[in-house]
Curated annotation (Swiss-Prot):
Monomer. It catalyses: tRNA(Arg) + L-arginine + ATP = L-arginyl-tRNA(Arg) + AMP + diphosphate. One of its GO terms (cellular component) is cytoplasm. This is Arginine--tRNA ligase. A motif ('HIGH' region) lies at residues 120-130. InterPro entries: aa-tRNA-synth_I_CS, Arg-tRNA-ligase, Arg-tRNA-synth_N, Arg-tRNA-synth_N_sf, ArgRS_core, DALR_anticod-bd, Rossmann-like_a/b/a_fold, tRNAsynth_Ia_anticodon-bd. It comes from Clostridium perfringens (strain 13 / Type A). Belongs to the class-I aminoacyl-tRNA synthetase family. Its EC number is 6.1.1.19. It is found in: Cytoplasm. GO terms for molecular function: arginine-tRNA ligase activity; ATP binding. HAMAP family: Arg_tRNA_synth (MF_00123). Keywords: Aminoacyl-tRNA synthetase, ATP-binding, Cytoplasm, Ligase, Nucleotide-binding, Protein biosynthesis.
Length: 565
């Protein structure tokens, strides 16, 4: 039963407002003693020509109270107190019946949503900054899918640009074939950094890099073969990371994919009469929108990444007919996307308003800079492995007899990192703190995973007791039991709000709420040793439902649960 909808229906019987509008006005009171749902009567004052306080008092008298413990007025608010036993039984039954689908819906049915995320640069390391976009995008994909949308995952690889000319030059001068086969990204990074170091004293190297990129653009056999090799070796390394994270994509079409699609974009902009020549370059002037010009073709005739993004957006709309196209890219690109979207709009594309850039913050880690050019980079693979190693040490210390130690260490270690990325608003910067991140207390991934494992441990012990009594839900009368059941009800609301805000942290924080409510309940009430068998069975059903909800919430943010810890 959807209690919020029930509240709206009961109010609708007495007021002239649309059901949907009533539902939107319903609030959750800040304190339990003020009820479980509250309806502010201010909006009715004008229509009913009465003070909100009087309206609330009248409605409290008239309203059908079936399914509610009581309905009271408090000033201008109409407060609903649900029947706690009926509510808890209803939620527990719903969770256990729907299982892995609990919290899902079909609200997005028939809607295509493109999600572009991860998008690492070929021949460069997958560093800790790349995980931010990957974690957010993968979580949004799961959330959208869960609520019935058709999400399309795109990895817009950085596989084109003048840097590939520099890389070809560097490889031909200093490349080590053996090192390239053994550790491709490390070797490509080494020669890339060397190129920049040498170019500081020998500017002619930059010309050589441009020359090799021109060869690549012109389809020179050797240049294309080297570029393809660098790309294949890089993807092989990237896939190791994606496998660790459980991430996949529907399309790997990178920047190079749009090379033959950019002329058409330029033609369309010329046809729309918005392309202007400026210092030899072709640009779209955006002064009246308080933005610098969007450069589409450089003065030397070369394309720029804005050109490729314009081509990519057009291609995606034609291919996927999207209702929304989401770009999960750092906040340093806000201006770039504003220029691209405005250019698409000025070219007469109505769908441009459905293109959304969702920016995210920076990743800070022990004063180390994330600069690929200087080679000073915190590699993501190293970070993930370090998290697994540290978790393994904790397991060895706390539970050396645990089975599947390696699998558990991997799930907790990687889960801890993902949780850290997705715990707060995505635009906030992340500062890594191993001690806090891997702690089993506080608002962390291990704390939520431990809560799940604790619930499963209780259920395994209960199985050994061979309990045959039917659950007596009328005995679930304590404050902690009701608060836990109430928290379990909120999964779908959290997911839908997370989708509306394009903010996975809503679901992450919800998982913390469930874990806290569960631990508060368990710390205040005995379960396995309670004498009343009906109450024991009811509490076990509540625990079973809690484990299911934690599992579903963690799945949505890309984290696996562990059965034992």
């Amino acid at each position: 039963m959807d209690y919020k909808k029930l509240v709206a229906e009961r109010i609708k019987e007495h007021v002239d407002l649309e059901l949907e509008n009533i539902e939107k006005l319903i609030e959750i009171p800040p304190k339990p003693e003020m009820g479980d749902f509250a309806f502010p009567c201010f909006q009715l004052a004008k229509v009913m020509r009465k003070a909100p306080n009087m309206i609330a008092a009248e409605l409290a008298e008239k309203i059908n109270k079936e399914g509610f413990e009581r309905v009271e007025c408090l000033g201008p608010y109409l407060n609903f107190f649900v029947d706690k036993v009926a509510f808890s039984k209803n939620i527990i039954s719903k969770v256990l019946e729907e299982g892995d689908k609990y919290g899902s819906s079909k609200i997005g049915e028939g809607k295509n949503v493109v999600v572009e995320y991860s998008s690492p640069n070929i021949a460069k390391p997958f560093h800790v900054g790349h995980l931010f976009t990957t974690a957010i995008g993968h979580s949004l994909y799961r959330m959208l899918n869960f609520e019935g949308y058709n999400p399309i995952r795109i990895n817009h690889l950085g596989d084109w640009g003048t840097q590939f000319g520099k890389l070809i030059s560097a490889y031909k001068r200093w490349g080590n074939e053996e090192a390239l086969e053994e550790a491709p990204i490390n070797e490509l990074l080494r020669i890339y950094v060397k190129f920049h170091d040498e170019a500081e004293n020998n500017p002619e190297l930059e010309d050589e890099g441009r020359m090799y990129f021109k060869k690549l653009e012109d389809g020179d056999q050797e240049a294309v073969a080297l570029w393809e090799r660098f790309k294949d070796l890089s993807l092989k390394e990237f896939n190791k990371i994606y496998d660790m994270l459980g991430v996949d994509f529907d399309s790997w079409a990178g920047e190079s994919f749009y090379n033959d699609k950019m002329d058409k974009v330029v033609e369309e902009l010329e046809k729309a009469n918005i392309l202007t020549e400026s210092n030899g370059a072709k640009v779209v002037m955006l002064d009246e929108y308080n933005m610098p010009p969007c450069i589409v073709v450089k003065s030397d005739g070369a394309s720029i990444y804005a050109t490729r993004d314009l081509a990519a957006a057009s291609y995606r709309h034609k291919t996927y007919n999207f209702d929304k196209c989401i770009y999960v890219v750092g906040k340093d690109q806000i201006l770039h996307f504003n220029q691209v979207f405005k250019t698409l709009e000025l070219a007469g594309n109505e769908w441009a308003k459905n293109c959304v850039h969702i920016p995210f913050g920076l990743v800070k880690f022990a004063d180390r800079k994330l600069s690929t050019r200087k080679g000073n980079v915190v590699l993501l693979e190293d970070l993930l492995n370090e998290a697994i190693d540290k978790t393994r040490e904790t397991i060895e210390e706390k539970n050396p007899q645990l089975e599947n130690k390696e699998e558990v260490a991997k799930k907790i270690g990687i889960g801890a990192i993902l949780f850290t990325y997705l715990k707060n608003s995505r635009e906030r910067d992340i500062v890594f703190d191993w001690k806090e991140m891997l702690s089993f207390d506080g608002e962390t991934g291990p704390y939520v995973q431990y809560s799940y494992a604790r619930a499963k441990s209780i259920l395994r012990k209960a199985e050994e007791q061979k309990i045959t009594a039917e659950p007596d839900f009328t005995k679930l009368t304590s404050k902690e039991e009701f608060e836990l059941a109430k928290t379990l009800e909120g999964l779908q609301k959290a997911v839908i709000l997370g989708i509306d805000k394009l903010e996975p942290s809503v679901v992450t924080r919800y998982s913390i709420e469930v874990a806290k409510a569960f631990n508060k309940f368990y710390n205040n009430h005995t379960v396995l040793n309670v004498e009343d068998e009906g109450l024991k069975a009811a509490r076990l059903e509540l625990i079973k439902a809690t484990a299911q909800v934690i599992k579903n919430a963690l799945f949505l943010i890309g984290i696996d649960v562990v059965e034992k810890m």
